[in-house]
Amino acid sequence: MAWLTLYLLSVLWAVAGTSTRAQSSCSVPPDQQPWVDGLQALMENSVTDSDFPNPSILIAMNLAGAYNVEAQKLLTYQLMASDSADLTSGQLALTVMALTSSCRDPGSKVSTLLKKMENWSPSSPGAESSAFYGPGLAILALCQKSSEATLPIAVRFAKTLMMEPSPFNVDTGAVATLALTCMYNKIPVGSQENYRDLFGQALKAIVEKISLRIKADGIIGDIYSTGLAMQALSVTPEQPTKKWDCEKTMHTILNEIKQGKFQNPMSIAQILPSLKGKTYLDVPQVTCGPDHEVPPTLTDYPTPVPTSVSNITVIYTINNQLRGVDLLFNVTIEVSVKSGSVLLAVLEEAQRKNSMFKFETTMTSWGLIVSSINNIAENVNHKTYWEFLSGKTPLDEGVAYYIPFNHEHITANFTQY
């Protein structure tokens, strides 16, 4: 009688609680608000008609209250015109939420996303944690548009997550928390099949794992996963055993902003909602008013202190030891660049000095990624890519944003995920 249960539930969805009230939240102190305004302006000003339309940026703009109305309109029109067939489930989900937050009807994009997810299952029993990121976004977007139709998919997703033994990923855990919290909130209390219990159990397991990644300074995972994690921990109905100190996290994030760590528009898009006291669960509640937003004056925007203009030396290694790849190599070069230069400048100088260091880049929503070095290119089918490390630690910023320090050893390692 599963169909009858779904029918009865569908009658009750409309009266189910839809509140997105934060369970644990904190706010930016008034004297620190100019830093957030400057961050938002940087993100909004990155939008041009030649860029890959990034739905995450439009969601952040709408949740925060856009200053640059022209950029907001441009992104909206670009996303409305995007071809759903060319998008992954995660990209399509973000597009649906972006258009919803713009008070635009996503149209057939919702039904296309639902079809993509109806037959969803992990690619393999031991699938990487990141394989759940896109489906998590899809369930979140579908929950906000048609929660009753999403229920069977969300149930399968929750059960799979609880059985999944693969290493935990904070970004994926945060998205899964938002998705299942949406479903949990939509189901009427006392409904059959114990769906709330299932989602509650899954949420408890996920937030416990997220809490284990909270560092002493409040950062959750790393500074770039903290934004989504803050959203998740602020709305989940199942709080972790280890209490989260939101104020400490906010304090550290604001300090990182002052150090210029958030320069990538995508990284800003993920942290901005939390800085504004919003989460992705607020997307359906965005009010679209007249185009009268006025940005703070430019004098309100603090900027990080400029760095020295002296030169630094960076040690740069390219390495490929993967079996099955024709060309194996491990080559190191020292290059000199101006202090404060981004890693991309190091790659360009190395390429100028030695043709073995020739590289190619691809534009993504996160900015430039290095797709090929020394004629060895990433391959989705083989799950290979170029990973950049400082010493033995993977970089958490892209080549167009990471700033090396003097005598730092950067390695580009061809590896698999």
From Swiss-Prot:
Gene3D superfamilies: 1.50.10.20, 2.170.130.30
GO annotation terms (biological process): cobalamin transport; cobalt ion transport
Cellular component GO terms held in the UniProt record: apical plasma membrane; endosome; extracellular space; microvillus
UniProt entry tagged with the keyword Glycoprotein: yes
Keywords for this protein: Cobalt, Cobalt transport, Disulfide bond, Glycoprotein, Ion transport, Phosphoprotein, Secreted, Signal, Transport
Residues where cob(II)alamin binds: 171, 222, 270, 365-370, 386-395
Disulfide bonds: 26-246, 103-288, 143-182
GO terms of molecular function: cargo receptor ligand activity; cobalamin binding; molecular carrier activity
Signal peptide: 1-18
Subcellular location as annotated: Secreted
Alphabetical list of InterPro entries matching this protein: Cbl-bd_prot, Cobalamin_Transport
Tissue expression summary: Gastric mucosa.
Entry-listed glycosylation sites: 311, 330, 413
Modified residues (Phosphoserine): 191
Assembly with partners or alone: Interacts with CUBN (via CUB domains).
Family membership noted in the UniProt record: Belongs to the eukaryotic cobalamin transport proteins family.
Task of the protein: Promotes absorption of the essential vitamin cobalamin (Cbl) in the ileum. After interaction with CUBN, the CBLIF-cobalamin complex is internalized via receptor-mediated endocytosis.
Name of this chain's protein: Cobalamin binding intrinsic factor
Species assigned in the record: Mus musculus (Mouse)
Name of the coding gene: Cblif
